[in-house]
């Protein structure tokens, strides 16, 4: 059913479109005046699809259960209730959406998205003249027709990312901000730029700052396999090459900085970063699935978080001596990585989260004499029990039967090969570092020495074959997350005085309510009143 309505009084749409009627309308044109109440009472309902989420958190649209509306035309209406378009719709089933006049932003403050992001059906979007800020239109794979009004000043990051049917875009003259992620993965072979825009310059379909010192945005479907960055470029901007289909990029000596997400998701196979580059932002090469080799700049001192995460084709990487610090997650999810060489000069691998790799080809990790800090559980996902090669001059670590310890042997740091069924922590160890046994799903039995004092965070998390563990009376500190193993049934603890529980403690922790904690009979009351331990099912030994 097609319907055309004029509203002389804002807030009265519900009187003209009862709920049952609204679900039957296929095309709706509204003229006159709209306010927030009209969106909340009517438009939100008739523009929201019905569906479910699959196991991968993808939204599956159910057209049989969704409203019938496919075209909503508000182009001759005026929104009179502020300048921000209210949030309405959810994974909208609309195919054509024409927004009203009177708005300067389609993104409502306090919301994380718009109701029409992630819409698989939206094909045409008409934005009103007067709109200044664009955001939240990402992941609409069939959106093809969109024209940016001359009034647009800002196109936020990721605004049209994943709108894979957009083939042509023209940046209006008043735009002062956008970046490469704004149109990431759009089917654009070249950007068009209004010649009167005072902020940007277009050369061969690529957008630069007006003075050519910053490369702003590279089209995802650039028609050539190779690209040489111009020698005027000093900064490769945030998300500049995101999701670009290009094999190789030449970086000139003029480039001093590569900002975060600059090459994320691009199809580059190799890259050499010149020594002129002094800073690289986080996530700069994340999801570069074809990246096989990389030469790092000799002028940077830090590798930030997730710099190469999910680079599945990367098999070998050498961290040069000029790098003093590398975030552990810089190499997260690199399942194809076989060899990591830390050259002499590297001092620190900082704990910024686990690598989250369940299967791994990692065969070799070279630890130099200068490395003094590694997070607990580092590189333990390797199936090679002898993955570590330790420089004998290193004064901070020791290696025994392939297991990495502190130099004096009092702290156990990493136990490679997660296929172990049993492990005996040797006498002399006083600290089990964080995540040492993380996700050792086959581990059924572990023995702890009488010298042990501290069990750090997530030490046994994910050890789902572990049903029982005995903690010696020598232990004084246990992290609340240390014993998070789904099938753990019994914890035997011989301490008369409850060890101090560290970490984010709550009075009721669902993870431990069915875990029996066996403690000395005379200490049962103390444990039941002790923060953290009170979450267990406490019973006397």
What do these predicted regions represent?
Residues 1-9, 26-34, 55-82, 92-105, ...:
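Structural signature of tandem-repeat unit edges
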Residues 40-47, 226-228, 239, 422-424, ...:
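Extended Gly/Ser/Thr-rich low-complexity repeat segments
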Residues 530-535:
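Helix-loop-beta element that forms the nucleotide-linked donor phosphate-binding surface
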Residues 16-21, 43-51, 59-65, 86-90, ...:
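Leucine-rich repeat
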Residues 8-17:
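Surface-exposed ligand/attachment interfaces on beta-rich extracellular proteins
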């Amino acid at each position: 059913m097609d319907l055309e309505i004029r509203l002389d009084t804002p807030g009265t749409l519900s009187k003209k479109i009862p709920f049952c009627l609204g679900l039957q309308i296929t095309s709706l044109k509204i003229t006159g005046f709209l306010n927030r109440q009209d969106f909340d009472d009517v438009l939100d309902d008739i523009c929201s699809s019905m569906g479910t989420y699959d196991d991968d958190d993808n939204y599956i649209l159910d057209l049989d259960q969704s409203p019938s509306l496919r075209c909503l035309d508000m182009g001759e209406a005026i929104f009179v209730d502020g300048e921000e378009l209210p949030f309405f719709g959810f994974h909208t089933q609309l195919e054509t959406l024409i927004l009203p006049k009177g708005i300067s932003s389609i993104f409502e403050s306090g919301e994380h998205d718009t109701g029409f992001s992630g819409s698989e059906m939206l094909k045409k979007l008409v934005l009103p003249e007067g709109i200044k800020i664009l955001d939240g239109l990402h992941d609409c794979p069939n959106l093809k027709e969109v024209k940016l009004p001359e009034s647009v000043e800002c196109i936020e990051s990721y605004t049209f990312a994943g709108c894979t049917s957009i083939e042509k875009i023209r940046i209006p003259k008043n735009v002062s901000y956008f970046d490469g992620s704004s149109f990431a993965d759009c089917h654009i072979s070249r950007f068009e730029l209004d010649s009167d825009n005072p902020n940007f310059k277009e050369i061969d379909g690529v957008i630069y700052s007006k003075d050519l010192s910053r490369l702003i945005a590279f089209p995802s479907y650039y028609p050539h396999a190779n690209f040489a960055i111009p020698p005027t470029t000093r900064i490769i901007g945030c998300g500049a090459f995101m999701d670009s289909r290009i094999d190789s990029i030449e970086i000139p000596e003029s480039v001093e900085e590569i900002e975060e997400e600059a090459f994320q998701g691009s199809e580059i196979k190799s890259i050499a970063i010149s020594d002129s580059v002094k800073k690289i932002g986080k996530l700069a090469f994340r999801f570069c699935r074809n990246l096989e080799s990389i030469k790092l700049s000799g002028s940077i001192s830090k590798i930030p978080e997730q710099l190469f995460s999910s680079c599945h084709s990367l098999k070998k990487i050498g961290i040069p001596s000029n790098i003093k610090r590398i975030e552990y997650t810089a190499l997260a999810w690199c399942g194809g990585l076989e060899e990591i060489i830390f050259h002499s000069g590297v001092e620190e691998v900082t704990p910024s989260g686990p690598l989250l790799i369940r299967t791994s080809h990692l065969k070799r990790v070279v630890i130099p004499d200068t490395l003094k800090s590694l997070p607990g559980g580092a590189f333990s996902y390797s199936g090679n029990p002898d993955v570590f090669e330790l420089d004998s001059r290193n004064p901070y670590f020791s290696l025994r039967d392939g297991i990495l310890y502190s130099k004096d042997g009092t702290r156990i740091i990493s136990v490679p090969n997660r296929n172990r069924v049993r492990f005996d922590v040797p006498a002399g160890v006083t600290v089990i570092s964080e995540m040492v046994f993380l996700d050792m799903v086959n581990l059924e039995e572990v023995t702890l020495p009488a010298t042990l004092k501290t069990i750090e965070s997530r030490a046994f998390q994910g050890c789902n074959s572990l049903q029982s563990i005995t903690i010696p009376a020598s232990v004084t500190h246990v992290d609340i997350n240390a014993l998070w193993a789904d099938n753990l049934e019994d914890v035997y603890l011989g301490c008369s005085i409850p060890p101090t529980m560290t970490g984010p403690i709550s009075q009721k922790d669902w993870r431990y309510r069915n875990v029996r904690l066996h403690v000395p009979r005379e200490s049962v009351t103390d444990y039941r009143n002790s923060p953290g331990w009170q979450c267990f099912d406490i019973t006397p030994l």
